[in-house]
Amino acid sequence: MNRHLTGKQKFAFGFGAIGKDAIFNIVSVFLMFYITDIVGLSPAFVGVMLFVARIWDAINDPIMGMIVDNTRNNFGKFKTWLVIGTLINAVVTVLLFTNFDLSQTAMYIYISIIYISWGMTYTMMDIPYWSWLPNLTHDPREREELSVIPRFFASLAAFTVGTFGLFFIHKLGDIFGGGSDSTGIFVFAIICSLIFIFTIGVTVFKVPEDQEMEKLIGIKVKFKDIGRILFKNKELLAIMGVLLTFNLCLQTLNGSIIYYFKYVVNAEHLFAIFNSMILCEMVGLLLLPRFIKWVGRTAAFNTSIICIISGLLIILISGYIAPQSMTLIIIGAGILRIGSGFMVGITTVSLADVIDYGEVKFGQRNESIITSTNTFLTKTSQAVAALIVGLGLSILGYTPNEAQSVVTINGLRIMILVSPLVFICLAAFLYHKAFNLKGDFLTDIEKTLQYKRQREFRERIK
């Protein structure tokens, strides 16, 4: 009873990631910059605010996963919450980048409330989107190919927002606000939100939801079950560690690199060049399925680690020997992004394998609760990275829009490039020492699950 999707359906599912990740990246890349350089609030406040918001997410995200798993209607549990979450999050994103020119105290309160609301509504949409992926196909090879498509479109969104975001903000500010970046980022947020609604709409209306399988394994989940689902599954805990450390590597880099190019090497234009190398991440994602067939998933993972470390070292060294060299930035960022493309694809399909493992070992898939860990860890890494960057900038004596001291410049080098190196090495350690869904063990899980499916199907048609 293997289920297969048409090429158009695979494309439509992945297409939704364009808008979804455009929204994520405008917050990930520009929120710190917006709050510190446009609104004029403390960078330390931003770091602490994001970190505190994640404490709430630790409770909220698994509960949202439970709500999705327990939803039963004719529209489909994934589509229902995907639509609701998208519409609300689009509005909240616009509000997040709306500068009402309030007093400083009022702005601190406003930003805090709206950002926490943004995190909750993003969860409402992101969990059903990624929970849906493991149910779209049960064939392991097709799943590897399918997992790459939304990640490719997500990288396309990250490339567009990261590379051209500042240009759009400045240009829109000139057109609608007389040169005001505050107006520019507000209009940019509106555009991203409209794209978000459109692309998710294509996914919802073009991709069928497999409600028959939901009926087969549709055991109602209670709140008390969440702890067991999350903490009894050792493979889930292992991949959570890999996801957290990998995301911390990227988020620390993404959240601070704009300061590096602007103040350390005095070449702000290199920020756009650096972000344009997300094209290489897209290439890495496209190459990944064939590369895995050639060398295996573990070797592909090792290749990704080597590429990320090599890219970071090239950028670090270039900052000393040729600070404004576009060529070295292109080479370093390009190698790094090929590695991150491999890593994103591998972790996505690995989380889907964990859902299969949970069904074999515990008799329940719990797609949304398990996938909620990915959403939570992504936001957690964003918050921890913002905390590192925000507190780091304050400790180093960073002053916006002014020349920085030697201490600040050297501190920025360490924070921006050495921290990601530490995090990616931790990710490699956890994948090799704690995560076991590889090789023969994964093959055994796939065969056991296929037998289980066939038995359940025969019993159902009797």
From Swiss-Prot:
Membrane disposition: Multi-pass membrane protein
Keyword Transmembrane helix among record annotations: yes
Function noted in UniProt: Responsible for transport of beta-galactosides into the cell, with the concomitant uptake of protons (symport system), and also for transport of homologous and heterologous exchange of beta-galactosides.
Subcellular location, record wording: Cell membrane
GO cellular component: plasma membrane
Origin superkingdom: Bacteria
Keyword terms of this UniProt record: Cell membrane, Membrane, Sugar transport, Symport, Transmembrane, Transmembrane helix, Transport
Taxonomic lineage: Bacteria, Bacillati, Bacillota, Bacilli, Bacillales
Family: Belongs to the sodium:galactoside symporter (TC 2.A.2) family.
Bilayer-spanning residue ranges: 26-46, 48-68, 80-100, 105-125, 152-172, 185-205, 238-258, 269-289, 303-323, 326-346, 383-403, 411-431
Keyword Nucleotide-binding: no
InterPro entries referenced in this protein's UniProt entry, alphabetically: MFS_2, MFS_trans_sf, Na/Gal_symport, Na/Gal_symport_CS
GO molecular function: symporter activity
Gene Ontology BP, a term: sodium ion transport
Gene: lacP
Protein name in UniProt: Lactose permease
